[in-house]
């Protein structure tokens, strides 16, 4: 009887359980990014006899990764003469203009020289540009245009 009981107890007891573990490493690499949008600067209508400069504005909206350092830069446009920005009527006539980063138009942004330093917030950031066409320019009537390339370096 004892042998039968021992055999029955041995069969009824569960085998010792075993547990194994493993690790899964989880990673991601976030790379800095910037997206840019611009608005046109339109000076409207202008006569060379106006007593004050003609003024215009434009916005550059940048969305850069959080804490990403970046700079905004402007080239001289299609018709620059050295550091002087110019719009052309396509017939060899030019209207001078400048772009500044302040409403008083004293902090001029020289082509490919002056950069606007910023730090990304991960949200859209608007940088307003302030344009000025000096009065007293003696040019033929017509439509004058230019195209500026905006560069974001990050």
Segment roles from a protein language model:
Residues 1-3:
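Bacterial N-terminal signal peptides that target proteins for export
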Residues 10-14:
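N-terminal signal peptide c-region/cleavage motif recognized by signal peptidases
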Residues 107-112:
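Solvent-exposed adhesion/ligand-recognition segments of exported proteins
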Residues 67-69, 103-106:
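Extracellular acidic loop/turn motifs
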Residues 17-89, 114-154:
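N-terminal small/polar-rich segments of proteins
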Residues 75-77, 98-102:
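Predominantly extracellular/luminal cell-surface or secreted proteins
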């Amino acid at each position: 009887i004892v042998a039968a009981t021992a055999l029955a107890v041995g069969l009824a007891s569960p085998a010792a359980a075993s547990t194994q573990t493993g690790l899964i490493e989880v990673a991601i690499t976030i790379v800095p990014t910037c997206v840019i949008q611009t608005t046109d600067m339109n000076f409207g209508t202008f006569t060379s006899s106006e007593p004050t400069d003609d003024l215009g504005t434009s916005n550059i909206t940048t969305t850069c990764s959080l804490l990403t350092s970046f700079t905004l830069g402007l080239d001289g446009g299609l018709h620059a003469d050295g550091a002087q920005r110019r719009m052309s009527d396509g017939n060899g006539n030019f209207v001078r203009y400048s772009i500044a980063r302040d409403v008083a138009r004293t902090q001029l942004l020289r082509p490919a020289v002056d950069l606007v330093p910023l730090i990304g917030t991960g949200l859209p950031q608007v940088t307003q540009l302030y344009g000025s066409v000096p009065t007293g320019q003696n040019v033929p009537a017509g439509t004058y245009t230019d195209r500026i390339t905006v560069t974001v370096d990050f």
